[in-house]
């Protein structure tokens, strides 16, 4: 992994009681040792694999103003991180779920792009077995379950300030207003809606195949083509490129897919991040509720699976062997 750390700072927030968070600030930057580089590489890998929301700084963002000064050389990175941690403590103190943690600021470069990663990591306790096979207590940073994370694409922010995607962050778990306080701390608002872009793409594909008057098999083949392209982009960590996708679909219609989306006003960006859960709808139908979970390949609709919209009834012809075996045993009174 071609990752180079420019500067990295570490501080701590300790929850003493329900209303107070103690601030513990380092007096020096961390040295980019092999261990530190491995930790940041793991953070980068875990964060890059997660679905993210996209945003941009508000005009009055204190963090953006301080970061701009730091980038211009008017403040050093350590001072920037110490002041920002203080602002983070003030925001966290407003919320009852505030737990504290290890606050990390890392300016690094990956594949010619500069990033600033900001995260609050939990420092957890566990056990380890030493070389004498004795069990001893140990502590570790819970990187895999980090949910208070934001990353600023410094290259994009500085070269294209009108962008709506240079800042990314993780949505908080259900029931926690993590995104709320972190957005307040960042002084940011949501920008590009990746899910909406992906939903728009799916609708455009359906309309494109309908206008081309394709039969059912041909429509499904196009959907599979779109899914294959988008999934390859997702696996490679690349965005969906509308023009590239249009080339993949050349021959489907006299009008190219990119021309079709522009003429019909789908408002799709030239490129946008792939959303795994939305793209899955290209090849599968899935849903759950009321104790029922259903998931099946789209090609089966109208062949083995039939839906009557008038009665909202789904009819399945031919059940999976393992399901059929369970049904037979239960209905015959067996266990």
From Swiss-Prot:
It holds the Pfam family NA37. Signal peptide: none annotated. Its main location: cytoplasm. It comes from the Bacteria. It is found in: Cytoplasm, Nucleoid. InterPro entries: Nucleoid_associated_NdpA. GO terms for cellular component: bacterial nucleoid; cytoplasm. GO terms for molecular function: double-stranded DNA binding; single-stranded RNA binding. Keywords: Cytoplasm. PANTHER family: NUCLEOID-ASSOCIATED PROTEIN YEJK, PTHR38772. Belongs to the YejK family. This is Nucleoid-associated protein YejK.
């Amino acid at each position: 992994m071609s990752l180079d750390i420019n500067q990295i700072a570490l501080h701590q927030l300790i929850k003493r009681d329900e209303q107070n968070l103690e601030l513990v600030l380092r007096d020096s930057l961390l040295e980019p040792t092999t261990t530190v580089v491995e930790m940041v590489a793991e953070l980068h890998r875990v964060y890059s694999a997660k679905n993210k929301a996209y945003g941009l700084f508000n005009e009055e963002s204190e963090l953006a103003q301080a970061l701009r000064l730091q980038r211009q050389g008017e403040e050093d990175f350590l001072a920037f991180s110490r002041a920002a941690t203080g602002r983070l403590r003030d925001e966290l103190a407003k919320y009852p779920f505030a737990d504290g943690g290890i606050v990390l600021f890392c300016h690094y470069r990956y594949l010619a792009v500069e990033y600033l990663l900001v995260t609050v990591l939990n420092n957890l306790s566990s056990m380890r077995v030493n070389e004498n096979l004795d069990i001893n207590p140990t502590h570790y940073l819970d990187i895999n379950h980090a949910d208070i994370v934001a990353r600023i694409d410094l290259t994009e922010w500085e070269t294209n300030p009108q962008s709506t995607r240079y800042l990314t962050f993780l949505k908080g778990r259900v029931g926690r207003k993590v995104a709320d306080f972190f957005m307040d701390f960042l002084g940011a608002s949501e920008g590009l809606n990746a899910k909406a872009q992906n939903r728009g793409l799916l609708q455009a594909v359906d309309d494109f195949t309908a206008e081309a008057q394709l039969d059912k098999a041909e429509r499904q083949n196009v959907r599979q083509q779109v899914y294959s392209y988008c999934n390859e982009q997702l696996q490679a960590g690349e965005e969906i490129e509308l023009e590239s996708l249009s080339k993949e679909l050349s021959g489907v219609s006299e009008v190219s897919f990119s021309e079709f989306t522009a003429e019909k006003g789908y408002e799709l960006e030239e490129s946008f991040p792939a959303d795994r859960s939305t793209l899955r709808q290209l090849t599968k139908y899935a849903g759950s509720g009321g104790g029922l979970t259903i998931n099946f390949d789209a090609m089966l609709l109208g062949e083995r699976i039939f839906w009557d919209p008038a009665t909202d009834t789904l009819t399945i012809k031919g059940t999976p062997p393992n399901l059929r075996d369970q049904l037979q045993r239960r209905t015959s009174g067996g266990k």
